[in-house]
Amino acid sequence: MIPIEIDSGSGFCFGVVNAIRHAEKQLEKSSDKLYCLGDIVHNTLEVERLGKKGLETIDYDAFSRLRGAKVLLRAHGEPPEIYRMAGENGVTIIDATCPVVLRLQNKIKSRYEATRSLGAQVVIYGKRGHAEVNGLVGQTEGTAIVIESEEELDKIDYTRPVILFSQTTKSLEGFGQIIDSISTRMQPGVTFEHHDTICRQVANRIPHIGAFATAHELVFFVAGEKSSNGKVLFGHCLAANPRSIFISSPEVIVPDMLVPLPASIGICGATSTPRWQMEEVASHIKALL
């Protein structure tokens, strides 16, 4: 039998585990309807599993119409506007914001309030429109500049102070490149401060995933189609091992993917991929061999 290894370093990060525990605890102790603002995790199968337990996912429009309900805020965090709206509408918040994200929100809010009178610009290196980034921008009353890549650095006014932060799940390498590029553009005497706000539990998975991928002839990377972290990690996985395949469920694996038969098979995933899903993938592969 071809050896199959599930990566011990893959699976939910602490923030996601914490949010799911919050949801399950609330569902177990109360019969009251529990809503979640947005997918609790970017993994369709896990969302469906919790949905069967009673967790109902809603969007922001539906949230604005709720009255007297109970709503879980996921690990990504939310802007102040959501808390204000909840208070006005009698909505009870179950706050499962990741502690790492919460610290970052507070740091951004503090620096924004301390420097806005000086004309400083808060810049966030992250994915525009991502839930976490929306929550971070909200700490600056919507004024923060979001930068996805070096190509967007012209949005910054280099004659004014710059305060740079990063979305917690971005790569250290990418953040370092942004810091270097901004540094070379700053006008003499103008302040530039940068804060390393990247979660190490997530960042450390990048070198780990590469080492895991090279240790196996064939790799199946398991993640939801919506997972930003999954796309980033799979890119590193593929770079380390060209015979890496992205899948979102076990059913998509067909016998042809196993040809030629590999000496070993590795299964890994994103920070939004549950362990049980990777185990299902392993079982499916064994049935095909």
From Swiss-Prot:
Pfam families: LYTB. The active site is at residue 132. It is an enzyme of class 1 (oxidoreductase). Dimethylallyl diphosphate binds at residues 42, 76, 130, 227-229, 272. The gene is ispH. It comes from Porphyromonas gingivalis (strain ATCC BAA-308 / W83). GO terms for molecular function: 4 iron, 4 sulfur cluster binding; 4-hydroxy-3-methylbut-2-enyl diphosphate reductase activity; metal ion binding. The lineage of its organism: Bacteria, Pseudomonadati, Bacteroidota, Bacteroidia, Bacteroidales. Coiled coil: none annotated. InterPro entries: LytB/IspH. This is 4-hydroxy-3-methylbut-2-enyl diphosphate reductase. Binds 1 [4Fe-4S] cluster per subunit. One of its GO terms (biological process) is isopentenyl diphosphate biosynthetic process, methylerythritol 4-phosphate pathway. Pathway: Isoprenoid biosynthesis; dimethylallyl diphosphate biosynthesis; dimethylallyl diphosphate from (2E)-4-hydroxy-3-methylbutenyl diphosphate: step 1/1; Isoprenoid biosynthesis; isopentenyl diphosphate biosynthesis via DXP pathway; isopentenyl diphosphate from 1-deoxy-D-xylulose 5-phosphate: step 6/6.
